[in-house]
UniProtKB/Swiss-Prot annotation:
The lineage of its organism: Eukaryota, Metazoa, Chordata, Craniata, Vertebrata. Its cofactor is heme b. CDD domains: cytochrome_b_C, Cytochrome_b_N. This is Cytochrome b. Binds 2 heme b groups non-covalently. It comes from Cryptotis magna. Heme b b566 binds at residues 97, 196. It comes from the Eukaryota.
Length: 379
């Protein structure tokens, strides 16, 4: 008799995705981040659901409701900090996952990659709206500054901003709609992640060598289920340490002050995972130019497959490309640091140079280096 997991309509989908899935025999720990992102998403949805049971999306009571969660709700402080630091872990895994894709040429799976870029935008939008909900100083002013960027759009800009605000400033209507969107978007992200997997399983996973692994496949279970569980345990270890020992390490002290439209904080900055994009935005003196650079800093990922000039898929055997990749990583860390600094000398010029280098590396230097490496091997 055939096994039920291979015949039952629902079990069959699970079986073909997580049990009998043929996987390359040589994928490294860099391939763990996909499953870790799935775990992060589940953690965020569950903790978010329990927070939503106690949170009120009203300007008068939002800040107090978060305080109430932390002080009066059973393990409310734990749920709140798991959710806040879970977002940080989510983005760490996201950056690693995207970095892996860039390094090993996973972007050659066009559909999977483009849905991944869409997922990145959706997660960033969700995180931004979530940061507004506690209604602290940085929540309010972050929302004001970032939504105001849309006013740079010619002709319709100011109308668009007021439409998003639901009034003439960030107020009750804005908070309510941000809560609604923040609640619904994770489910959209879950659906998109399903489509992401669907397209991935059409082609099968890439591997570090970038060569076809059709001749040497192993079943996903037990080999990669065990490997993924190890990754999940390490993720839990880091998240637990963060939540229990220094829950406010990655937050902003200004957000413990209730929102006050009459008092602007000295340094308005987003959460750490947006600082690189914020630094690129600030490095251009023109408002519209800055907004375009901000969007392009992420959207550029969608053009990476078109800029692939190498005769090999992966960077594994290309020392020059590897060198440029790690310069790009260092550049992004520099931008992250600059994004958190005040707008003054020497941070302005460092930010501008790092922004130029970021676009130069991705658009010019990496494709040219790949062509050079092809010629070195007389390909």
């Amino acid at each position: 008799m055939t096994n039920i997991r291979k015949t039952h309509p629902l079990m069959k989908i699970i079986n073909n995705s997580f049990i009998d899935l043929p996987a390359p025999s040589n994928i490294s720990s860099w391939w763990n981040f996909g499953s870790l992102l799935g775990v992060c998403l589940i953690i965020q949805i569950l903790t978010g659901l329990f927070l939503a049971m106690h949170y009120t999306s009203d300007t008068m009571t939002a800040f107090s409701s978060v305080t109430h969660i932390c002080r009066d709700v059973n393990y409310g402080w734990l749920i709140r900090y798991l959710h806040a630091n879970g977002a940080s872990m989510f983005f760490i895994c996201l950056f690693m996952h995207v970095g892996r894709g860039l390094y090993y040429g996973s972007y050659m799976f066009m559909e999977t990659w483009n849905i991944g870029v869409l997922l990145l935008f959706a997660v960033m939008a969700t995180a931004f709206m979530g940061y507004v909900l506690p209604w602290g100083q940085m929540s309010f002013w972050g929302a004001t500054v970032i939504t105001n960027l849309l006013s740079a759009i010619p002709y319709i800009g100011s109308d668009l901003v007021q439409w998003i605000w639901g009034g003439f400033s960030v107020d009750k209507a804005t908070l309510t709609r941000f809560f609604a969107f923040h609640f619904i978007l994770p489910f959209v992200i879950t659906a998109l992640a399903g489509v992401h997997l669907l397209f991935l399983h059409e082609t099968g996973s890439n591997n570090p060598s970038g060569l076809s692994s059709d001749a040497d496949k192993i079943p996903f279970h037990p080999y990669y289920t065990i490997k993924d569980i190890l990754g999940v345990l390490l993720l839990f270890l880091v998240l637990t340490c963060l939540v229990l020992f220094s829950p406010d390490l990655l937050g902003d002290p200004d957000n413990y002050t209730p929102a006050n439209p009459l008092n602007t904080p000295p340094h308005i900055k987003p959460e750490w995972y947006f600082l690189f994009a914020y630094a690129i935005l600030r490095s251009i003196p023109n408002k519209l130019g800055g907004v375009l650079a901000l969007v392009l800093s992420i959207l550029i990922l969608a053009f990476i497959p078109l800029l692939h000039t190498s005769k090999q898929r992966s960077m594994m055997f290309w020392p020059l490309s590897q060198c440029l990749f790690w310069i790009l990583v260092a550049d992004l860390l520099t931008l992250t640091w600059i994004g958190g600094q005040p707008v003054e000398h020497p941070f302005i010029i460092i930010g501008q140079l790092a922004s130029i280098l970021y676009f130069l590396l991705l658009l010019v230097m990496m494709p040219i280096t790949s062509l050079l490496e092809n010629n070195l091997l007389k390909w």
